[in-house]
Regions:
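Local cysteine-cluster metal-coordination motifs and their immediate loop/turn environment
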Residues: 64-78, 83-96
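Rieske [2Fe-2S] iron-sulfur-binding subdomain
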Residues: 1-62, 82, 96-178
Length: 178
């Protein structure tokens, strides 16, 4: 029997290009994942450390979750918000505040198990960006760089456009160090 098979961990990205130790080390920090002006009640996709994310607002609450329906893994970023939550395009499960499942069409009278709630992540809107940490406590103060002049009228605030670099994070980091 082969004992070298890696154990599956639902907290790690399925297609991870990092060593597990490195991923856990990097996941504790806060990263910008989207421009705040692009986030509405409709789901938007993003990627952080190989983890696919869905971002949406529900009653002015920011929700950042793993971009996979807990039922069959379909990306929720392909769904639509019907006013009560983001609806999965496959079987119609709906996710509202805090990523909690609030409808299973096939079983409308059943109590919804916590297994059907989304895996959500700590996120805040600051400096025109959506910031996220994959392992931080949602109630902890976010460790985001301080920009003391952001609200100062004597300074101009710039939010750079998003650039999608088609390579793994290690190569991106090497490019920034040069």
């Amino acid at each position: 029997m082969n004992t070298n098979i890696a154990a599956f961990s639902p907290d790690l990205p399925v297609h991870m290009t990092f060593e597990e130790h490195d991923w856990h080390l990097l996941a504790q920090y806060w990263y910008p994942i989207a421009l705040a002006r692009d986030i509405t009640d409709q789901p938007t996709s993003s990627m952080l450390l190989d983890m696919p994310l869905v971002i949406y607002k529900m009653n002015d609450e920011l929700v950042v979750a793993k971009d996979a329906c807990p039922h069959r893994g379909v990306p929720l970023s392909l769904g639509k918000n019907d006013g009560q939550g983001v609806v999965c395009r496959y079987h119609g499960l709906r996710f509202g505040n805090e990523g909690k499942c609030n409808r299973i069409p096939a079983h409308p009278q059943h109590k919804i198990s916590e297994r059907f709630h989304l895996k959500t992540y700590a996120a805040v809107e600051k400096y025109g960006l959506i910031w996220c940490s994959l392992t931080a406590d949602k109630d902890a103060e976010p460790n985001i760089p301080v920009m003391p002049y952001w609200n100062d009228a004597d300074y101009q605030q710039l939010v750079c456009p998003q650039v999608d670099i088609k390579c793994f994070a290690g190569r991106q980091l090497e490019g920034f160090i040069d």
